[in-house]
Amino acid sequence: MTWGFGDCQYRVVESWGKGPEGRRLGIVSSIATDAQDRVYVIDREPNPAIVVFDRDGRLLDVWDQDFLKVPHSIWIGPDDRVLITDCQTHLVYEFPLAGTVVQTWGTRDEPGAPGKPFNQPTWAVFAPWGDLYVADGYGQNWMHRFSADGDLLNSWGGTGSEPGQFDTPHCVKIDPRERVLVIDRGNQRIQVFDKAGALLDVWSDVLSGNELVIDANDIIHLAEAENRVSLLDLDRMVLGRWGEKGDAPGQFVEALHGAWMDSHEDFYICEVPFTPNRLQKFESIR
């Protein structure tokens, strides 16, 4: 059976990451791949760790990091720098692929004041021009921008539904036009900003989005909590949707939370909040 829409067609790889050499996962909240297409999964609960697989689902490594409490998101850049947000410690960590922290942002175990970093940060990315963008989405509704040297440049947002305000800014990504895309989950929209945080556009017609990835053809794949993936172009047009509720391979039991696409355009999805081991690989067949 195939899944997808239009030219974006996939075949689910059953039991990926669950073989005899694999590790039984708990609640998985986020996923990313490196330049070699190794797959890094946040195993959030009950024992926080970063679990590493090869692209065929064979276990390679486990980063059992005592300082991780409630890791929420993982992002890996083209230079293989790794960013992880931790909601409980109010920190953003930067790793190399070796798994040793090289830098942190925030103050451990101290939530930031309103409008200040961080209070349960949800997502972080480096932009191609070097700035760091952090969605501070669970404890407050702000976006923060840092220089490549780690200096806070500016913050924007605040709680509300007006353009530029947020209700759970859950994920941030940079698109090929160098725009900052923020999934404003509670307001069921994507807000588009320039590099400095000036509002450019507001995209509605989404359902509780959690993460987005952009493929080589500039198609946005938006993982939504309502058991579906929406496909959009960079001009906000909805191209199609796919997804089906259920527990069979290829179906979705819970809220789609983490998504990533590797260099082969294979698509990875993980689900939260209550079903363990909900990680699926969809192999591209287009």
Predicted feature residues:
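Eukaryotic scaffold repeat domains enriched in small/polar residues
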Residues: 1-286
